[in-house]
A protein has these predicted regions:
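Short amphipathic alpha-helical interaction segments
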Residues: 36-50, 126-142, 147
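Short helix-to-turn junction characteristic of helix-turn-helix DNA-binding domains
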Residues: 9, 18-24, 110-114
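Short alpha-helical segments that sit at the start of domains
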Residues: 1-15, 80-108
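Short acidic, hydrophobic short linear motifs in intrinsically disordered regions
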Residues: 24-34, 115-125
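General nucleic-acid-binding
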Residues: 33, 39-73
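Short glycine/proline-centered loop/turn elements that form peptide/ligand docking sites
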Residues: 6-11, 40, 96-101, 131-134, ...
Length: 182
């Protein structure tokens, strides 16, 4: 898969971080409620900073602490994700939604514009079968994909985006294009 296809958005919990930061700058330790492991949080924020979504600065106002805030690009993308979050399973918390899962971005953009995609083709692009199935099952639960089992000589499991799934895929593609333009 093309390295330019993958961004920090495809990492789990990135959208939840952006939605939290949309309210304003946060001290890094306050983001641990979203990404519980400090090392994972630090890595995620470094990737988001490299993608131009956040600025991470160290402040020495008596105590040393790390402040994280969205860049202009990050604010624009966070607004798109805020609308997306409201459209997808509005009664669920962001942590329960497929849109904030690791590899959702990759899966939804792979399916975008296609009539359907066979499960094994999706797995080929991500290489983690269990993760792909977890994401696809969550997407089906959120009403973003339709799963169809077909027996045409060989058993195939096909996935296609619902109309809402297509709209969400368009948002994620737009976000990807904005990030690649930086």
């Amino acid at each position: 898969m093309d390295d330019g296809f993958l961004t920090s958005i495809g990492n789990g919990r990135t959208i939840a971080l952006m939605l939290k930061l949309r309210d304003g700058p946060c001290i890094m330790k306050d983001l641990k409620e979203i990404v519980l492991n400090f090392q994972s949080l630090k890595i995620r924020l470094n990737e988001m900073e490299k993608d131009g979504l956040v600025n991470v600065t160290t402040s020495l106002d008596g105590h040393k602490y790390v402040v994280v805030e969205l860049t202009d690009l990050g604010r624009e993308i966070a607004m798109l994700f805020s609308i997306t979050n409201m459209a997808v399973s509005p009664n669920k918390n962001i942590s329960e939604k497929s849109i904030d899962m690791k590899h959702f971005d990759t899966v939804v953009r792979l399916l975008r514009g296609k009539e359907y995609m066979v499960q094994r083709e999706i797995v080929k692009n991500i290489k983690t079968f269990d993760t792909v199935i977890r994401v696809l099952d969550a997407m089906e639960s959120d009403g973003l994909v339709i799963k169809e089992e077909v027996h045409e000589g060989v058993r195939q499991i096909r996935y296609s985006l619902t109309p809402l799934g297509e709209q969400i895929a368009d948002v994620f593609e737009s976000v990807h294009q904005k990030m690649m333009a930086v």
